[in-house]
Amino acid sequence: MAEVRLGENESIDSAIRRFKKKIQKAGILSEVKRRERYEKPSLRRKRKAEAARKGGRN
C-alpha cells in the first residue's frame, strides 16, 4: 500500500500530491476501476487479446 509521511514544514497539499503520484505509479486506481464490476473470463480474454493486437500493455 502507498504510504506518505508528512515531513517537517511540509504542507498537507504537497503530501497529498505525493500520495496521488504514488497511487498512480503503483496502478492502484486503474486496478480499482477494473474491479468495479465483474468481468466474465471470456470478456477478459477478449480484452487482453485486443490490447495485445494494438500493442499496448496488458
Curated annotation (Swiss-Prot):
Residues 49-58 have a biased composition (Basic and acidic residues). GO terms for biological process: translation. GO terms for cellular component: ribonucleoprotein complex; ribosome. InterPro entries: Ribosomal_bS21, Ribosomal_bS21_CS, Ribosomal_bS21_sf. It holds the Pfam family Ribosomal_S21. Residues 38-58 are annotated as: Disordered. The keyword Ribosomal protein applies. The keyword GTP-binding does not apply. One of its GO terms (molecular function) is structural constituent of ribosome. Keywords: Ribonucleoprotein, Ribosomal protein. NCBIfam families: S21p. Belongs to the bacterial ribosomal protein bS21 family. This is Small ribosomal subunit protein bS21A. It comes from Trichormus variabilis (strain ATCC 29413 / PCC 7937) (Anabaena variabilis).
